[in-house]
Amino acid sequence: KAPAGGYPFYETEAKYDNIILLSNNGLQGAGKIDFIHSTSQTLPSSLFAFLPDSTVGIVDFVNRPHEQAVEFPPVKSDEAYISYVPKEDVLRVRSLPTKELEFFDGESNLRGGIEIRPEGMRGKGLMDLSRATLISDDFSFKRWDIDADTASFDLKNENPADNEEDPLVFNTDNVTAHVSFKDRLGEFNSNQGESKVNFPVNQYYCLMDKFKWYMDNAEIDMERASGKDITIDQGVDLKGPNFYSTHPKQDSLQFMAPKARFNVRKKVIYCDEVEYIDIADARISPDSMKVVIRKRAKIDKFQNATILANYITKYHKFDQAEVEIKARRDYKASGRYPY
């Protein structure tokens, strides 16, 4: 049994105040380790193992939230693996295959590990945010926030129509991430100018610079700020497309939309500021500059649209047109032809 005041711990100021057992399994003991704002308590069926440079064990782990100076989030697990390295001033905590680390009072769970130091808490792995997942090799945690310089972000399909519908409705990689559980907002920026965003259920992908995820509204705003005008030989100024259909029957239908909003529950993409879509030899301009994309790449009909045919010579112009776009070279329309 430890003397009053405890045993010196690895030649540091830390003390161990409990029973130490010496056997063929080495030095072992039961009790708890208090480190910064965390407590690691051995389970009834487990013991700490005292190694030459560290203490390891399966514990009931709690990290209490702290909002002043260096911030720490609330984390807990009733069964986690810890490694305490006093001379490095670090406590490492890792989830078990059957037990994730619970963050932010149940708002998210981490399948991976964290490091607690006086400078703060970092980690890596997969964060399950209930409706979304965030994957990174280097998370930084604060009282209410998750940050990552490089991350992948997915939004789950919460209400699939059938077993064949994709389990994800939104996916992007290589973005910076800032998620605030206080503001109920996630903000993401591309690390490479533009990031590819996949919409598996809509059978589309787009290229965008930045995104904002409104957690409670289940919506995400997207913006493309880096699009440049491209001049082709015929002298027509075109903006490079950033929305592309992946539907096998639409022949890579594509168009430019610098802004869009995605409704996660409805699985609908609302594209804004769409000047035109080139279909076959026609240039079709929606009067609202809006394009609505539903599941399986279905585009809502345009009302009161303008059609130029062909779009190089602009010889024929139709207005007040109702247009149904079916594929890159296939559309059906009716309208007025002034002459």
Which stretches of residues belong to each language-model region?
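Structural signature for solvent-exposed beta-strand/loop edge elements and short helix-capping sites
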Residues: 1-339
